Amino acid sequence: MEEEQLLDYEEEQEEIQDKQPEVGGGDARKTKGTYASIHSSGFRDFLLKPEILRAIGDCGFEHPSEVQHECIPQAILGMDVVCQAKSGMGKTAVFVITTLQQLEPVDGEVSVVCMCHTRELAFQISKEYERFSKYLPGVKVAVFFGGMAIKKDEERLANDCPHIVVGTPGRMLALARSGKLKLDKVKYFVLDECDKMIGDADMRRDVQEIVKMTPQQKQVMMFSATLPKELRTVCKRFMQDPMEVYVDDEAKLTLHGLQQHYVKLKEAEKNRRLLNLLDALEFNQVVIFVKAVKRCEALHQLLTEQNFPSIAIHRQMAQEERLSRYQAFKDFQKRILVATDLFGRGMDIERVNIVFNYDMPEDSDSYLHRVARAGRFGTKGLAITFVSDENDAKTLNSVQDRFDISITELPEKIDVSTYIEGRTN
């Protein structure tokens, strides 16, 4: 793969030839079917290391979410876990806290491997590991993905071997095949957004090859917001008697506190309507999803010209540029982000309270992951979808049928208290 080429598995597949050279037992399966925003018990009840509790306190978290309450107590005992839960419900913290709690760092040994399907998500997960391990100075974290020079990764592994490695399957496999990344001491193996990796045949092959290089006795954990029944079966083949946690069944996988509306209009009317809505609505930060790179750039330019300063992120940017723009948006340097679907999964920006589907997503899965950028962790938010033709209408109907929800036409006036926390009209 050429270094400047920007691939992620959502858009196209990395080609292998271009790459350079304890298990818990018990039968504690659980299926949860109710939403609970927080539990009265706190993180202290999990008997975590004081250093981890201190970091959790710094993040402002007091009570575990439903998925954390269900997973963490069993996971910190070493049990394999397969978990489906709504976006924004704190799945990342489950495996980050769980692996840090159990980790006993040994110099020169990789103990934790965490893989996900996009580079941005890998970068974000590595930052979460750094955040929760800030009072564990002996713990070293590294992130490896394509689009960056592989030599730097090899030097890091040789000179300052991390205990925790986060990355995308393509780059991880290249490093493992070359012998630079040694996986024979791995104790904890995590797949985030596992449906993307297990559901994609090419990526699944990469994952399987990596798994074969790890010890048979290890803890395996897999997480996703969408996990069809047929994929659950495949996921469980990687595990030994896993605990299964499904927080809300698939038909009810809607986001608590998220208002969802559509606007029927012609293609040529989209820009004017978007500008009017940005004028009328109150927002902290907004993400606007489009279907193609050219549309992303054009809309970004239009918004800037109309005094709505924005940031654009798409797959044709250099990797450093993409990460830099992502961080700039996360740091609140601009309030509007225009993006293609590569930003649609797993990205966690706490201030986003409105998502626009300027272009209709391809399917109901993409819809869920896009609108989940608003209303993270059970907070309020607003999702507005533009419907401009018959195909758009069909997709919207399929979303409503699958998730058993009613997406209504956008009213002329919206009560600000329905989509911004702590506001009254």
From Swiss-Prot:
EC category name: hydrolase
GO function term, MF aspect, one: mRNA binding
Catalytic activity: ATP + H2O = ADP + phosphate + H(+)
Motif Q motif per UniProt: ranges: 41-69
Motif DECD box, chain ranges: 192-195
Keyword Hydrolase tagged: yes
A Pfam family: DEAD
Keywords recorded for this protein, A-Z: ATP-binding, Helicase, Hydrolase, mRNA processing, mRNA splicing, Nucleotide-binding, Nucleus, RNA-binding, Spliceosome
SUPFAM superfamilies: P-loop containing nucleoside triphosphate hydrolases
Name of the protein described by the UniProt record: Spliceosome RNA helicase DDX39B homolog
Domain of life assignment: Eukaryota
GO CC terms of this entry: nucleus; spliceosomal complex; transcription regulator complex
